[in-house]
Amino acid sequence: MAATAAEAVASGSGEPREEAGALGPAWDESQLRSYSFPTRPIPRLSQSDPRAEELIENEEPVVLTDTNLVYPALKWDLEYLQENIGNGDFSVYSASTHKFLYYDEKKMANFQNFKPRSNREEMKFHEFVEKLQDIQQRGGEERLYLQQTLNDTVGRKIVMDFLGFNWNWINKQQGKRGWGQLTSNLLLIGMEGNVTPAHYDEQQNFFAQIKGYKRCILFPPDQFECLYPYPVHHPCDRQSQVDFDNPDYERFPNFQNVVGYETVVGPGDVLYIPMYWWHHIESLLNGGITITVNFWYKGAPTPKRIEYPLKAHQKVAIMRNIEKMLGEALGNPQEVGPLLNTMIKGRYN
């Protein structure tokens, strides 16, 4: 990744940039949180640039500046969505901090002492807007983050916008890569300063920014040992245990070696987040509401002939499968860690 990223530094991957018709830069460094680790810029390229195709083919991140993937949605704001999105239910998370750590409610029974750091509530879109405006008016620490898969409850205008997405381009990407089906389009509406802590997904993702600006810091799968994910059976599976704001280097010493790949995406930008790449996402400080739509695809089928040496993401998949199988064989997820320690301690190091 380093070589290809270096080629694209000239395109301004990590610098505040001026938008067409804007007076000055769209954002500045004061809107970014400070962290202890170094980062390199993610390339910003035209979708017609051969280097962009090469990066996607190699499963490396790239920001595509001109796909027009979600062009009809660039007019979306809270008012437009409230008028047109329909009367369906939306999942809205609330937290007393800026961090929204994902958790799987189905796995909470495995860890009885687990307490989620955010609460999920189902509400109508107008209720979300009213609650958001109330929080903004009275101040305080409470934050909201709407995260909802787009479905058939949306209104006609949203359907028309959705049909106007550049499906021709994205379907070609899917076909060229041999990916599986589109599994979902996740709508994300966040308050300024909201953070989704570092995690990885087991799907390919085109992350399309619609409103506002988001900073995205990615880490390749080979930095797994630096990011210390929760156990597979934990509700926060696939999430890093490291607090980026205040890293505990005694518990997580390898985090000192982590190196990120960074960009800020704005309206119309599409970030390719490869499967198994860690990503930390933050809505810029003092940047207003952000709106994003994810395009999640299943990965390509496992090739019949495995090539060695295995790639880092394949090793992550193997580790996940080992944890899952041990949990099933032992009948108790709590026994997985002690058994792995018994197997490895003093034998392989």
Swiss-Prot record:
Domain JmjC as annotated: residue spans: 142-312
Species annotation: Homo sapiens
Superkingdom classification of source: Eukaryota
Result after altering residue 201 to E: Loss of HIF1A Asn hydroxylation activity. Slightly stimulates 2-oxoglutarate turnover
Cellular location(s): Nucleus; Cytoplasm; Cytoplasm, Perinuclear region
Annotated residues for binding of 2-oxoglutarate: 145, 196, 205, 214, 294
Keyword annotations from UniProtKB, A to Z: Acetylation, Cytoplasm, Dioxygenase, Iron, Metal-binding, Nucleus, Oxidoreductase, Transcription, Transcription regulation
Residue spans of biased composition, Low complexity class: 1-10
Sequence positions that bind substrate: 152, 181-183, 201-203, 238-239, 300, 321
Predominant location: nucleus
Assigned EC number: 1.14.11.30, 1.14.11.n4
PROSITE patterns: JMJC (PS51184)
Gene name tied to this protein: HIF1AN
Effect of residue 199 to A: Prevents suppression of HIF CAD activity. Strongly stimulates 2-oxoglutarate turnover. No stimulation of 2-oxoglutarate turnover
Effect of residue 296 to R: Loss of HIF1A Asn hydroxylation activity and slight stimulation of 2-oxoglutarate turnover
Region listing for Interaction with VHL, in residue ranges: 2-125
UniProt protein name: Hypoxia-inducible factor 1-alpha inhibitor
Catalytic activity: L-asparaginyl-[hypoxia-inducible factor alpha subunit] + 2-oxoglutarate + O2 = (3S)-3-hydroxy-L-asparaginyl-[hypoxia-inducible factor alpha subunit] + succinate + CO2; L-histidyl-[ankyrin-repeat domain protein] + 2-oxoglutarate + O2 = (3S)-3-hydroxy-L-histidyl-[ankyrin-repeat domain protein] + succinate + CO2; L-asparaginyl-[ankyrin-repeat domain protein] + 2-oxoglutarate + O2 = (3S)-3-hydroxy-L-asparaginyl-[ankyrin-repeat domain protein] + succinate + CO2; L-aspartyl-[ankyrin-repeat domain protein] + 2-oxoglutarate + O2 = (3S)-3-hydroxy-L-aspartyl-[ankyrin-repeat domain protein] + succinate + CO2
Taxonomy of the source species: Eukaryota, Metazoa, Chordata, Craniata, Vertebrata
Protein function: Hydroxylates HIF-1 alpha at 'Asn-803' in the C-terminal transactivation domain (CAD). Functions as an oxygen sensor and, under normoxic conditions, the hydroxylation prevents interaction of HIF-1 with transcriptional coactivators including Cbp/p300-interacting transactivator. Involved in transcriptional repression through interaction with HIF1A, VHL and histone deacetylases. Hydroxylates specific Asn residues within ankyrin repeat domains (ARD) of NFKB1, NFKBIA, NOTCH1, ASB4, PPP1R12A and several other ARD-containing proteins.
GO biological process: negative regulation of Notch signaling pathway; negative regulation of transcription by RNA polymerase II; positive regulation of myoblast differentiation; positive regulation of vasculogenesis; regulation of vascular endothelial growth factor receptor signaling pathway
Pfam families, per database record: Cupin_8
Catalytic class of the enzyme: oxidoreductase
Residue numbers bearing the N-acetylalanine modification: 2
Cellular component terms (Gene Ontology): cytoplasm; cytosol; nucleoplasm; perinuclear region of cytoplasm
Residues under site feature: Important for dimer formation: 340
Binding site for Fe cation: 199, 201, 279
Subunit structure, as described in the record: Homodimer; homodimerization is essential for catalytic activity. Interacts with VHL and HIF1A. Part of a complex with VHL, HIF1A and HDAC1 or HDAC2 or HDAC3. Interacts with NFKB1 and NFKBIA. Interacts with NOTCH1, NOTCH2 and NOTCH3 but not with NOTCH4. Interacts with APBA3; binding inhibits HIF1AN binding to HIF1A. Interacts with TNKS2. Interacts with PPP1R12A. Interacts with ASB4. Interacts with UBE3A. Interacts with ANKS3. Interacts with NECAB3; the interaction is indirect and seems to be mediated by APBA3.
Region of interest (Disordered), residue spans: 1-51
